[in-house]
């Protein structure tokens, strides 16, 4: 009697092969799909990282898209000079030249009636004169004592260019814009044959309750910390040091049961601002127990240790730390390349393919 398979048995074998093939294909597909969650306190640079992904992995911002950011550039510039002028009153700093008091009054009038996306030569002239004033500069140097955008000096130092009638924001201008992220912003791009879905989540406390919806199936978390926040307080709670808030948040994310198998990538961001600030503002403002020198290398290494020491599962979980400057495209490109290699390795392990 021959050992032939019945039609039914053949169909069963084919079905089994198809299931195996589908499982393998699903595994490979899962290994190629990366869900990245960008977390961190407010103003830590998350949205700037997302903008860099568009510049690096897509085709950047078109001229039309850049034009749309003109409104934000002008708004950020005007709000920055207004924040400094208001702080002068609180900090009891006088203008270097008495005539600037008239300019300050004029600023509020012109800013209140300014057409969106337009900077008149009159308004630009008022802002330039104010920004050059010794009292305004003295107040700017004390910006840790009030809330001020990181991009303030970038725009205010370049008023001649950005106030031109034919001005179109550059990619760098776009990177420097600040708009508070509310809700969840999703970005898709392909890199090293991986399909990335990146989720930027609002960092202010009021936004955090929305994060939970993103947690399922996350491949990796990029947690952003602004190194330069060590001597600042929160916009939403002026009693809370920003770095302490970041540490508290990192602790809750790094040791969360949801993320037992999730790669944690720590971006210690704004290293350029930190390098400047540490020369004049001691790290002991944030860490009174710190006894090291106020050099970039030593102070940055100390902050890195403070965060990495929060990981309570060091034996099974690694935190991958990178020092970043989110406005520097080359730096972000280099770091993201290294991050992707870690993700590929860990992703393949998860799918049993490594």
From Swiss-Prot:
Keywords recorded for this protein, A-Z: Cell cycle, Cell division, Cell membrane, Cytoplasm, Cytoskeleton, GTP-binding, Lipoprotein, Magnesium, Membrane, Metal-binding, Myristate, Nucleotide-binding, Palmitate, Transducer
Region annotation G4 motif: where it falls in the sequence: 265-272
Lipid moiety-binding region (S-palmitoyl cysteine): 3
Record's GO cellular component terms: centriolar satellite; centrosome; ciliary basal body; cytoplasm; cytosol; endoplasmic reticulum membrane; Golgi apparatus; Golgi membrane
Residues at which Mg(2+) binds: 47, 181
Membrane-topology annotation of the record: Lipid-anchor
UniProt domain G-alpha: residue ranges: 32-354
Span list, region G1 motif: 35-48
UniProt similarity note: Belongs to the G-alpha family. G(i/o/t/z) subfamily.
PANTHER family xref list: GTP-BINDING PROTEIN ALPHA SUBUNIT (PTHR10218), GUANINE NUCLEOTIDE-BINDING PROTEIN G(I) SUBUNIT ALPHA-3 (PTHR10218:SF230)
Protein name: Guanine nucleotide-binding protein G(i) subunit alpha-3
Originating species: Mus musculus (Mouse)
The organism's taxonomic lineage, starting at the top: Eukaryota, Metazoa, Chordata, Craniata, Vertebrata
Gene encoding the protein: Gnai3
């Amino acid at each position: 009697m021959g050992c032939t398979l019945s039609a039914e048995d053949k169909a069963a074998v084919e079905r089994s092969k198809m299931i195996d093939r589908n499982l393998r294909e699903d595994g490979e597909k899962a290994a190629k799909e990366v869900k990245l969650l960008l977390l961190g306190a407010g103003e830590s640079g998350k949205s700037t990282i997302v903008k860099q992904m568009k510049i690096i992995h897509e085709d950047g911002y078109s001229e039309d898209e850049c034009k749309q950011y003109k409104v934000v550039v002008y708004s950020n510039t005007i709000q920055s000079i207004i924040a400094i002028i208001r702080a002068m009153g609180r900090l009891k700093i006088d203008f270097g030249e008495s005539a600037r008091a008239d300019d300050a009054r004029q600023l509020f009038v012109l800013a209140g009636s300014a057409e969106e996306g337009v900077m008149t030569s009159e308004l630009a002239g008022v802002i330039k004169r104010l920004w050059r004033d010794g009292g305004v500069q003295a107040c700017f140097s004390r910006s840790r004592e009030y809330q001020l955008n990181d991009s303030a000096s970038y725009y205010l130092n370049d008023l001649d260019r950005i106030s031109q009638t034919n001005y179109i924001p550059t990619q760098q201008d776009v990177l420097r814009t600040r708009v508070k992220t509310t809700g969840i912003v999703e970005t898709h791009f392909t890199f090293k044959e991986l399909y990335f879905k990146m989720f930027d989540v609002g960092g202010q406390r009021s936004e955090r309750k929305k994060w939970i919806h993103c947690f399922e199936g996350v491949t990796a978390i990029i947690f952003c910390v602004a190194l330069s926040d060590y001597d600042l307080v929160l916009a939403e709670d002026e009693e809370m040091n920003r770095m302490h808030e970041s540490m508290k948040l990192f602790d809750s994310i790094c040791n969360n049961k949801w993320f037992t198998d999730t790669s944690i990538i720590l971006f210690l961001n704004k290293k350029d601002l930190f390098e400047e600030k540490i020369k004049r503002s001691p790290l002991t403002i944030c860490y009174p127990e710190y006894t090291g020198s106020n050099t970039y290398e030593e102070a940055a290494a100390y902050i890195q240790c403070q965060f990495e020491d929060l990981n309570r599962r060091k034996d099974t979980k690694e935190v991958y730390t990178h020092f970043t400057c989110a406005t520097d495209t080359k730096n972000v490109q280099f770091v993201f390349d290294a991050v992707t290699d870690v993700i590929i390795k860990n992703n393949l392990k998860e799918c049993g393919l490594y």
